[in-house]
Amino acid sequence: MDALYKAGKFKRFGLSNFLPAQVQELYDCCKENNYVLPTVFQGMYSPVTRHSEADLIPLCRKLGISYNAYSPIAGGFLVKTVEAMKKGGVGRWDPNHLAGKLYHSLYNRPKMLEGLQQWEDIANDAGLGKAEMAFRYITYHSVLDGDKGDGIVIGATKPEQLEQALLVIEKGPLEQSVAKMIDAIWETVKDDAPYDTYQGQDRKESL
């Protein structure tokens, strides 16, 4: 990796889906050997997947690594209904396919579904789209800090989806009362919430 960096093949060394201990170990190895240091981390982060606030993001702050949040709408979970989740799904949410099995293992859990119902109720009462609420919350009410190089990875299959996401983000912060209700959802879901896409619940045993 260091040779590729010195050859000008990339500008920043990034990590993704690492545990905090792994980030520290890799950083220390790079430091000791004068290798290029990681300066950006891409990690799961949404209103219902916030475990990284407790350890990973603080570690990134200490090491000078910016944090780019992927799945700000939790892989599409936050735009679904509880009824739809219980029925299964189509596309990447089809439980008969590998990706669908993964997504259901991450999100189709009792506390997550309870939080999803709360999410829908808040959106309906506030007159907001569920995706809009997620994008605006993560942008303006989370621990992400643009001054530290943090950002959001917006997944879109069509240009129109990206444009729509950017438009709702430009609306600015949510009403403080709405943001507080969203904060409260975390207390509902945190025991069932996944840590990242590939380690899911397994990280509990590694902490």
Predicted features along the sequence, with ranges:
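Glycine-enriched alpha-helix->loop->beta-strand junction motifs that scaffold or abut catalytic
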Residues: 9, 29-39, 60-68, 144, ...
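Terminal-tail/helix-coil boundary detector
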Residues: 62, 86-114, 118-121, 125, ...
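Aromatic-lined glycan-binding groove of carbohydrate-active enzymes
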Residues: 52-97, 129
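Glycine-rich beta-alpha junction loops
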Residues: 19, 45-49, 71-82, 137, ...
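Generic structural signal for well-ordered alpha-helices
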Residues: 1-2, 23-27, 57, 116, ...
